[in-house]
Amino acid sequence: MQQLFSQHIARIQQIVQHALELARLDGLWIYAGQAKYHFLDDQTSPFKINPHFNYIFPDPTVEQSWLFLDGKNKPKLYFYAPQDYWHCTPNPPTSAFFADEFEWQMLTDSQQIQQYIINPTHCAFIGEQTELAKSLGFEHINPQKVLNVLHFERSIKSEFEIECIYQAQLTALAGHHAAKEAFFASKSEFEINLAYLQATKQSDNNVPYGNIVAINQHSAILHYTKLDFTPPCERHSFLLDAGTSYLGYASDLTRTYAFEPQSEFAAMIAQMEQFKLDTIADMQVGMNYLSYHTQMHRWISQMLHQFEFVKLPADQIFEEGISRTFFPHGLGHQLGLQVHDVAGFQQNHRGTRKAPPEIYPSLRCTRDLAEGMVLTIEPGFYFIEMLLNQWKNHPLAPFFNWQKIDEFKRYGGIRTEDNIVMRATGAENLTAKAESISSR
């Protein structure tokens, strides 16, 4: 990891130098951020680090620390380690594999940073705390020219970042295995979530996103995070969308299970799994992500015809937009320090944005695929009453097999999701690679 991180930092230095030249600035100050207090309270939300800080310093727990970069000299880290008997104080990771890439300065008081910030009017500040930046004399606060370069470059992962995301696959798969066992052992959603957290050695405060632990019809709620405490009387299906993080880099995996392995719903899950793998096998550098999303809608249309949910030819199902009712989200998204990572729509360093087509408003990526991109591939098929109701008074309503659709609402839906990295030769499935190791 040390060699990969050295290469990662060398690349960041070039990126920062380019961004500063474009913005005609001398340096970049990045603030890690700080926990936010609840309204009229002395309790805080869990700390979430500034991703631009974590991009450079691979420890997502360091609060109120600073980084200074000029693209030429060794990055300077101002590590905040106060003396405090009320709270756990951070232990500076000065012996970690990444430590030698930084020039260290300890801060025991957050106000001490003022003495190190020289010529703030000639530097950029990157962070959420804009009032703090103003009080320290910064004028170029989150300048768009700088952010455009950083965001676009963050969409192409270094080998260090790819390794971190791969490591996060391994831990997430352990959690998925434990959660699957808990479901088939008749546990509640709450208990399944506990099994996942225990297996991944995480708490609800540091998962990369809220775990989606959905039994039966709850799978039809795309971001279901409620967690029932009581096991259901009957079990039909289970959808788990949950990940882990490694040094701040996320994994994002989804699996769906049928309680009855010989059921028609189980056959649908197998079909969706094959659609996902076929998509990954087809992906090539230079192709636009939208083309794979559109192809998935054609396959979903075939599935609607094949399983007799809609009694129309597959081509007509696609052309009429019926597949969008059963697959209402995008095929996937960029993945990295943020689960929905940056620059999914950004086409270049200048920040040119390409919006998704009107018919696919939930698509999160309109980019041409490039080597080093890490993305999720997550097709879905759902029975969502709110969306289905829009067709009940439509001229095509008689072609919907409403009786069968109503019967399948108890399953909620299907989603299957792997994480891939684009290579020169095509997509490498990081999830499948980790599964092959985990199953040995």
Swiss-Prot record:
Its cofactor is Mn(2+). Splits dipeptides with a prolyl residue in the C-terminal position. This is Xaa-Pro dipeptidase. NCBIfam families: PRK13607.1. Its EC number is 3.4.13.9. Keywords: Dipeptidase, Hydrolase, Manganese, Metal-binding, Metalloprotease, Protease. It comes from the Bacteria. One of its GO terms (molecular function) is aminopeptidase activity. It catalyses: Xaa-L-Pro dipeptide + H2O = an L-alpha-amino acid + L-proline. The keyword Protease applies. Mn(2+) 2 binds at residues 241, 252, 417. The gene is pepQ. Binds 2 manganese ions per subunit. One of its GO terms (cellular component) is cytosol. Belongs to the peptidase M24B family. Bacterial-type prolidase subfamily. Mn(2+) 1 binds at residues 252, 333, 378, 417. PROSITE patterns: PROLINE_PEPTIDASE. One of its GO terms (biological process) is proteolysis. InterPro entries: Creatin/AminoP/Spt16_N, Creatinase/aminopeptidase-like, PepQ_N, Pept_M24, Peptidase_M24B_aminopep-P_CS, X-Pro_dipept-like, X_Pro_dipept. It is an enzyme of class 3 (hydrolase).
